[in-house]
Every structure is written in structure tokens, then in C-alpha cells.
Amino acid sequence: RSEDGGTKIYGASGRVKRPGLWELPMGTTIREIIDEHALGMQDGYCFRGVIPGGASTDFLVAEHLDTPMDFGSVTRAGSRLGTGTMIVLDDRTCPVGMVHNLEKFFARESCGWCTPCRDCLPWTAATLEALEDGRGEEGDLEILESHCWMMSPGHTFCALAPGAAEPLGSALKYF
């Protein structure tokens, strides 16, 4: 079933009928976790995407629902397994607002030691807030993309900024 053996604690939060944690075989698919263990999306909501491994992992979308939740499969799909606690995004929640919340969290948690965290994260959060409120400006998306590059591995002292860049970059790609 999976290239990784044993079991793992998986979780699902968001507009699912039964948010929670479950110990399941490694490699259980995203679809099975959402549909069978979290009992699907709440009435009136449809699946839009998922952050499969916690706040610092890339979004996956409907084409990835049959991805086994193991290290190799999730990596090949374009994200990371991380904690295995999925944040499920529905079709009525604004992806910009969701990513804005995540970037505010990362900006608040930054120690401020390196430039990408100290400068990019607060600016990124403010730009996402402006976009969400309809105050975006031409060129904002390109600047956000450049911030993803500046916050990528090799440009920072620790993994905080690269973790913040993952959901931002994938949201720019998918939404």
C-alpha cells in the first residue's frame, strides 16, 4: 500500500463533517481520509484544496486526492507529508484570506534575524490583506512570487521562511 511502513496519525480540519485525528496505515489516500474518516465536506461546501502536512506545506488540489499520504508520494505530488494534519480548503473560503492568515502567523513567529523573514513576511502578509480587501495593485502577484524565491531554502538562516513560502507559492500556482 505504501513505500513507507507502519501507521501514522493523520488529521483533517476545515469544513469537513468530522474534524479529528486518526491512526491509519501509512499511505492512506487524501480522499480516504477526507471522505471516510472526516466523513466528507460539510453540506453546502465542496473541496477546493488541501495543505497536507500542516501550515508550512504546499497546497494540493482535486487532481491529488488519490495521492497516498506517505513521504514519497506527497513529495512527488508537489508538497510534503509534514505532520500529516491536513487543512482542508473549501470552495467558499477565500484562498487569499487563508494564506494571509498563514503568512501573518509566520511573520509573528519570526525572530527577525534574517532579511527574508524580517522584511518579506510582514510585507507579504500586508499585501495579501490588501488583495483580500480589494486594494491590490498591479504587480503585487509578481512581487509575491519574488518573495517566495527570496524565502526559499538557501536564502534564510532557518526553515521558517521557506515554510511560509510553500503555501504562498502553491496558492499563487493553483488559485
Identify the function of each model-found stretch.
Residues 1-175:
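Redox cofactor-anchoring modules in respiratory/redox and cofactor-processing assemblies
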